[in-house]
Amino acid sequence: MSRSVVCFVRSSSNRSCSMSDVNHAVPSPVQCAHDAIEYGIDAWQRSVLLLDVLRERGNIYLDHARSGQPPVLAFEYEVIMDGRALPQPANYALARIVPPDGSPETDPKKRPFIVIDPRAGHGPGIGGFKMDSEIGIALKQGHPCYFVFFFPHPEPSQTIESVTRAEIAFLECVAQRHPDAEDKPFLIGNCQGGWAALILAAAAPEMAGPLLLAGSPVSYWAGVAGKNPMRYTGGLLGGTWLASFAGDCGNGTFDGANLVNNFEQMNPSNTYWTKLYNVYANIDTEPARFLEFERWWGGHFLMNKEEMEWITQNLFVGNRLSAGEVVSADGRTRIDLRNIRSPIVVFASWGDNITPPQQALYWIPDLYDSVDAIRCNEQTIVYCLNDRIGHLGIFVSAGVAKKEHAELISALDLIDVLPPGLYEAVIEDTQPDLPGLEFVAGRYLIRFEAREISDILALGDGREGERAFEVVKRVAEINQGAYDKFVSPWVRAASNPWTAAWARLMNPARVERWAISNLNPWALPVKLTADAVRTWRQATSPENPLVKSENQVSRAIVRGLEGYQAWRDGAVEILFRTIYESPWLASLVGLKEGSVQRRTNETASWFEEEFKRLKRLELETWFEKGTLLDGAMRLIIYCGRDLRVVDERPFNAMRELMRESGLDAQIRLSDLKQVTKRQTFLVLLDEERALAGLPKLLVRESDRRRALDVAYALAATVGEIAPVERARFDRVAEVLDLAPCARRATEATESA
């Protein structure tokens, strides 16, 4: 009996506790009313403030347009050359960036930087949008910095070729301003500015220094099945004729706002909800960042019809750049990317749905079928992949600027002297116990790992899907010819400056800005109400249940729009492949089974083979001759050949040693680069003969001992020397008639 009573009491106690918890969890009617009133006031105030932010956006848009839409740079600048005054005028200009207060003094002997921003509908400035940006990082390291920007309206006769000629003139101007610089200017091409930088470097290879292509599409057909739907757009629209139609409707001018609209349609959840809801939900902190970005995003620029036709026909749909099919108007110059003599650095991200890694990198297998072919052409290609950042984040993210951009810029001299080949840049956090930490500048360690062409191709799912784009190219050419012959004359006859201006004014990308601005008389009460709201602002607590419900509703809307996007993109891909992978359409446009676009690596001519033969003959004379630097560099390359990794620590240690000994004043970076290339080829051509020739380069015993000791010390900066590398050092010591490195190090320790 007593046991049952105890059980009854315990169960009653548990039930009472549970009921008290429930009563505590359920808010009282008074609390519910308080939360509702508090949330209602806050939601109304946020709505008013959001409308006022949109009004400010409209005013900023109008003010920016009235001022001529200058670059939205965070830095002061001065224009030093105007492309509109050139013999072949272009609406481009070259500006010198004025270092802000607190920045290190610019060193005229350091290599100058030239940033080329994309002309893809928006205005210039994204490359220097913040202090933590490509320009900001360059200025912090003391480099002279220049910016290539453009004006809102193109010159009447402007073409892509005239733009390239203007950029070549800018490059000459920078070189003349820095005659004592340690090497050629470093070119940074952002997004569409990347292919412009490639064309510039291929057209004037003797003038251009290293290139950084940031989020730049070069191989436009590449991608992964189930992703990257933007590449299907040209096919579903029937090719390039629509760009010509838009140019004809614009009275010979293409409106860049159309490109902005296309970008926004790619991500409907952000365009129609997330972007504005983020401002609404964080109305007390977010408007300044939002308005700063919208100033650039809403600055729409124009192109000539001929420029947009060239871009769509040669790049987006034609994909002719990596095929070596781009030629000048007079037919005298062919743009071959293999002509580029300086290192090419590619920065791409897996989170970028506008320029996925395949489109940023597949031009490499388009040009070369093996890394040996890259080496034979004396090219150095480096790529770096981010795991998650989006397209715009590549240019505006402070985290990316402080990590990838800062490390790639800091390692630029090392990249410039890398042996020809293909490398992946791997950037990692340093650890306190990292060997050689004193030779790492900053938080991150960068190393360059040798890669093969197969590693690039492994980033995608094969290239079979690209055959459909061959069909698109043929269909586009047919439709373009039909449009030019039968439709374009009628559209041009119906267009005039007034209709073109009206069409631009009524573009949705512009209407949403000027319609909610002080031009609208209804904006005045919005401003007055918003001023009162700011005075009596009553923000609710984030713990308010209705705020949490609002967030849940927002997430549900985002999921719904993302679901629509996934369905739309899947339907687009299915429709594209249904049309363009059909055998009958391929046959109809003249493509045979298995035919692919001809690539430059399949068209090796007798001239190219003869060039390679003469290069080998030239190298033959260098096995037994050279300077002390040649001998030391050959020793280093021979000993580290099997590692396939180049670390920044040995290079930084070598630079420090050169500064301490005064050799940095005698050996220029360009000299070091040429010696590294030459000795790399000699070791690759005949390793044993290169080793046997070392005694003739390092004649004196003191030079031999010093070169071997320095090479061994440099190798030790990354930690314990690998057995395979130690064996090579011992082999070198034997050839040079010296004691093995390990024994000499032991003897030195004992004597100390």
Model-derived regions: residue spans:
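Conserved acidic catalytic loop of the alpha/beta-hydrolase fold
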Residues: 157, 166-184
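Short beta-strand/loop motif that positions the catalytic acidic residue
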Residues: 346-348, 352
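Catalytic-loop region of hydrolases
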Residues: 30-106
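Small-residue-enriched hydrophobic alpha-helices in membranes
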Residues: 594-752
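Alpha/beta-hydrolase-fold serine-hydrolase catalytic core, especially in secreted/extracellular enzymes
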Residues: 20-32, 151, 316-322, 328-342, ...
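Gly/Ala-rich beta-loop-alpha elbow adjacent to hydrolase catalytic centers
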Residues: 188-193, 197
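Short, surface-exposed "cap/lid" segments of acyl-processing enzymes
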Residues: 71-73, 79-154
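Alpha/beta-hydrolase-fold enzymes
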Residues: 18-55, 180, 197-309, 436-537
